[in-house]
Amino acid sequence: MRLRLPTLRLPRSRRGRRLAVQGVMALCVLALLPATWMRLGAGDRVGTTADAPAGEVVMVFGAGLWNGRPTPYLAHRLDAAAELYRTGKAKVVLVTGDNSRVEYDEPDAMRTYLTERGVPDDRIVSDYAGFDSWDSCVRAKKIFGVDRAVLVSQGFHIHRATTLCRSAGIDAYGVGVDEPRDATWYYGGARELAASGKAALEALFRPDPHFLGPQEGGVAEALASASR
């Protein structure tokens, strides 16, 4: 027995076809509105490591592990953060990622990668509950007391991250890491369209992160160590 799929039939009248096309266009516009808002929210506060203002904290978002090591995208983010530290544009690196399972620890893998590239261990602070971008931004502000930070992520994500952190109360500047326009990049860009809708709701309603917890003094202690 052959399965017949339903066919999409356009209206026969010219007016009906015009309304159908207008409806599709309206849906496309609505789908793009959150992503457009994210870019406008970031404004001119996104650039390269050379453009980034000097400050105290650089914040790196997790981007997955392969066999316990940072994925290439995460490694590139960490390379940019290490460059900001070496050039004196940051005194402390806040690594924020997922450690919801014992066998999966993004922050510790990020810390190891940075120390292997010359960033002192006492200048690295770990947030083990950065389960998504909004959680990372809110926790940086409320748990770690970060008021101003340079954020590092890929170009397709950095506008959303910057807008969310600004909505969370952080004076944020985003550094976008360039990547080849391969399948992974296009997948990330497409994923951003879906993630932007969720992010717009988060910025509007400002929910608590999945895990808030008590305040931590890691960033303040690392900055004090840097000033000695």
Please place each PLM-identified region on the residue numbering.
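Structural motif marking the loop-to-transmembrane transition
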Residues: 12-20, 182, 186, 190-193
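N-terminal membrane-anchoring alpha-helices
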Residues: 2-52, 212-216
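Residue-level signal for alpha-helical transmembrane segments in multi-pass membrane proteins
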Residues: 31-37, 59, 198-205
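A transmembrane-helix-recognition feature enriched in membrane-embedded lipid enzymes
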Residues: 189-211
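Short linear elements at protein peripheries
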Residues: 207-228
